[in-house]
Amino acid sequence: MRAVMLEVPQALLEERRAKGLDKSDEMWEGELHMVPPPPDRHQALGGELFLVLAPIAKARGLLARHDPSGLFRPGVVHDWRVPDQMYAPPEARSERGIEGAASLVVEILSPHDETYQKLDWYASVGVGEVLVIDPETRRVELFANRDGRMVPVGPVVIECLGVRAETVDGALRLTWDGGTADI
């Protein structure tokens, strides 16, 4: 369900904060997007994926972060997104989270989410690549930042990690120098 509130009651925001329901909320140029908790399949895939990709990223000198961790437009207070995972150079770290140019953002699809609407924003803050995964089919799409726009690329080779992603027999297969994992 999509709802638009012209004015959000402070009590609602405080209740969401108190119950921990605001962790994945996003601020799109000052407009609050209240995001529900992801379904179980989404969370399970995200956890398994992070266990595989985080050590690879760390070995390449990248920070590994997962939801709820914010990606912020540098220098702007009310403009951030909360991807499922992101991998970024250490210099992108701030007290708020990651500022701008993450090397890779991972978005795991949920019903009625706004993954594809975020692509232009990710490009505008300098994200290098966005990996989109369907948790039901394990289908993967990779978008790369080309001159400030996210464009689909193939085959799915995550350049910043040196990882190939493909769907094999209903599983997400990740292959890298020295390893393979089926999720």
Regions found by a protein language model. Name each.
Residues 1-8, 14-18, 22, 33, ...:
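C-terminal interaction segment
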